[in-house]
Regions:
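N-terminal targeting signals for Sec/Tat export/insertion, comprising classic cleavable signal peptides
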Residues: 48-72
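A short, surface-exposed interaction/processing loop segment used at functional sites
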Residues: 68-82, 158-169
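Short, well-ordered, aromatic-rich surface patches in folded extracellular/luminal domains
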Residues: 37-52, 113-237
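Bacterial N-terminal signal peptides
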Residues: 23-33
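A short, structured loop/turn motif at beta-sheet edges
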Residues: 65, 91-99, 131-137
Length: 237
């Protein structure tokens, strides 16, 4: 066998070895991708658009791992001309997270007819529910729904939004208008006692900032602490 023949044999062996490596590489890449796909959390999103209301728009995205994202836009308050875009992340309690996904399942993940279709009803905002997971991506637009599960979800998300909007206003007032905190916290405490708010712990950071701020009057600081310690009534039932 000549030197040239030996070189050809060695080249052929190297090519065969290279070909053997490709299936292993493909398997490795597949295994590295599959876990990330499998662990992507499911999500439920609620959004509401209501011109000339406060806020005019908001959306809440809740993931099956409990992570949640809220964003809104509109006036800081009904009697203010200041407009603000706001967004924040927070963690839901296990009970509320489980309730949201349980109600989404009862509503067939919003895949069927959700809106009542009654055109005589007053417009209360353009609402949308979206469900996403590895197998589904379904949504429904509605003004009013007769489905009990959708009604409960709507009330729960609106209670969540009310809590987050208190957080938005308190953040603004604490920085720019501290005298407005007294009335704002009074309203928040009253609504929490009535069960109109959900997940008060989501705004605990700003409540703590107010309580820790010695430049804020004591009655306001005391009310902020009381709200932090409250166990609100279940919302959305």
């Amino acid at each position: 066998m000549t030197v040239r023949d030996l070189r050809n044999v060695n080249t052929a062996r190297m090519r065969i070895r290279s070909l053997h490596r490709w299936p292993l590489l493909a398997v490795f890449l597949l295994l590295s991708v599959v876990p990330s796909i499998a662990t992507d959390p499911a999500s439920v999103t609620f959004s509401l658009d209501f011109p000339n209301s406060s806020p005019e728009h908001y959306s809440i995205v809740v993931q099956s791992d409990g992570h949640a994202h809220y964003e809104s836009s509109g006036k800081v308050s009904a009697d203010s001309d200041v407009r603000d875009a706001y967004q924040t992340d927070f963690t839901l309690s296990d009970a509320t997270r489980a309730r949201i996904f349980g109600l989404a399942a009862q509503a067939h993940y919003f895949s069927g007819k959700v809106d009542s279709g009654n055109k005589k009803l007053a417009f209360t905002g353009a609402k949308k529910l979206v469900y996403k997971d590895g197998q589904r991506n379904s949504s429904a637009d509605y003004n009013y729904s007769q489905q009990p599960a959708v009604q409960q979800l709507t009330t729960l998300f609106q209670s969540l939004a009310a809590t987050m909007e208190f957080g938005r206003r308190m953040t603004y007032f604490h920085h720019y208008q501290k005298l407005a905190l007294d009335d704002e916290l009074k309203r928040m405490e009253d609504q929490a006692k009535r069960g109109d708010l959900a997940e008060l712990q989501a705004v605990s950071p700003v409540l703590k900032e107010i309580y820790d701020d010695t430049s804020v009057i004591n009655v306001v600081r005391a009310r902020a602490r009381r709200i932090m310690e409250m166990q609100p009534l279940p919302a959305g039932k």
